[in-house]
Amino acid sequence: DNKELYVNLFTASTLDWTDTGLKLAQETNYPEEETSTISITAAPKSAVTFRIRIPAWSKGAKIEVNGKAIDGVTAGEYATVAGSWKVGDKIVVTIPLQLRTESTDDRKDIQTLFYGPTVLNALNPSTKFIQRGFYERNGLDGTIKLGVQKKEGTKNYFIIDGDEFEPAYNGDNTPYHMYFQRKDEYVGFAGKLTDVLNPKRPAAQDRSESTLMDDIWAGAPFKDRAAFIKKVQEVTKTYQDE
């Protein structure tokens, strides 16, 4: 209807929308950087509403129009940016890049490591699943923050427990693992494992098999340490009662 423009991908590009007169340029190095700037290079004949996709995995995404933040930026939805546009107007989208894991559909213990939208492969020649634990590395927002270092002089390369993780798009011939097996035998927080076993809750009709740590971190993000401790106490009591 020449009134709405959907932005689904953050990639360096230009648009010449002849029917409306709108021209724009998107400048970005995403996903190696977390911002994308959309600049109006020719004004449309009438108002155009931008619908900007905010990835479901994102935390803390924001959009600024000419330096002013807008409301209604929600993960997993399209943010609405409406207005009458002139040459030089800028929309800056910021999607913080954070480490996280995602499980396969059929097994929670088989996971992949992501940095923002980027799959990270572990460079390792083993012919068996490598095992890694990540819950003890989580920050309050549920993303991985502890016990991880970026490889010096690189972007999107990380070192974890001696293994180098690189973007899947790198595409060289080094043996790698795209999936790893989660190692979660013990409870761990704030970068440290304890000697307390991480109990499992068997699968039931209304849920898949899970562990104490699974159920605690299902409540992330936590607004503060008190909210996190409260969740730990609630979940622990549930396991004790069962």
Enumerate the language-model features and the residues they cover:
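C-terminal beta-rich recognition modules with glycine/proline-rich loops and embedded aromatic residues
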Residues: 1-39, 74, 83, 94-186
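Extracellular and analogous surface-interaction loops
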Residues: 38-46
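Beta-strand-rich binding/interaction modules
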Residues: 47-65
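Short strand-turn-strand beta-turns centered on an Asx-Gly dipeptide
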Residues: 63-71, 116
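Short, surface-exposed beta-strand/beta-hairpin micro-motifs centered on an aromatic residue
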Residues: 78-80
